[in-house]
A protein has these predicted regions:
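An acidic/histidine-cluster motif and surrounding catalytic segment
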Residues: 1-88, 92-252
Length: 252
């Protein structure tokens, strides 16, 4: 079974200096016969992109992450006619895929149609409810998600005032804690979440989280905890569940 059968062409967001991550993502997709499109970006401070708006709010966001996701989504809208777009950062872990007892196409078809965006990878500070469900603003992680075309258009219209501009107008679409997840995955239509994939903390030489360190900082602690949690759930529980079991929450 090709587990990624039916997946739309992946749009992979990559920091241009991190060639190892690009090679990793290309090799993983190649294992499943999938050819992604890569979007490689310089660091925000080295680019000609611009974010305008409330300076105090902008200071709280990751400008490179925010801008690269929006530019990628806009490019997908302008250059495809696909009804579904799937977006990856370059640090997605694919080990969960071997535990799926279904393929990607079957998973999407099993979900009722009342969603416009779907978060497919998360970083969790506590044990999440392991069932496809409505995303909450504390569901962190922007590593992988699907957008319907209509949702993506509303999002792009909100942040870009001119079609070809590299100027993004920063504002939270709802009164929520500022984060790129909430910029992208809140406020433009119903959003679901379920961790089909995991956050990769292991496989890179470029700057990333080291799972072996003893002194966890504010970022590494939740990321390592979450990685181990999701990996264990898929290996121990998810691998024994049918797709219908997952949809019905029998492994939650």
């Amino acid at each position: 079974m090709n587990k990624l059968h039916g997946m739309p062409c992946p749009n992979v967001i990559n920091l241009s200096e991190c060639e190892d991550r690009k090679r990793y993502m290309a090799s993983k997709f190649a294992e499943y016969g999938v050819s992604p499109v890569f979007y490689s970006y310089s660091r925000f401070e080295d680019s000609d992109n611009e974010i305008v708006g409330d300076e105090s709010a902008i200071a709280l966001t990751s400008k490179g992450c925010f801008s690269s996701h929006l530019l990628t989504i806009r490019d997908w809208l302008l250059n495809t006619e696909d009804e579904l777009g799937i977006f990856f950062e370059d640090d997605v872990d694919f080990e969960t895929v071997k535990y799926w007892n279904f393929n990607f196409d079957e998973f999407i078809a099993s979900i009722s149609d009342d969603w416009d965006a779907f978060q497919l990878c998360g970083i969790y500070e506590t044990y999440p409810l392991m069932i496809p469900r409505a995303r909450k603003f504390w569901d962190h992680g922007i590593q992988c998600y699907i957008l319907k075309r209509s949702y993506a258009q509303r999002l792009v219209d909100f942040y870009f005032k001119d079609v070809g501009s590299k100027v993004m107008h920063y504002s939270m679409p709802q009164d929520l804690p500022p984060s790129v997840e909430n910029n992208i995955l809140n406020g433009f239509g119903p959003t679901l979440t379920f961790p089909l994939f995991n956050h990769n903390i292991n496989d890179f030489k470029s700057e990333n989280i080291n799972p072996c360190i003893d002194n966890y900082n504010q970022q590494t602690g939740p990321s390592i905890f979450s990685y181990r949690l999701i990996e264990a759930w898929w290996r121990i529980t998810g691998s024994k569940l049918t797709l219908q079991d997952i949809i019905e929450g029998k492994g939650k």
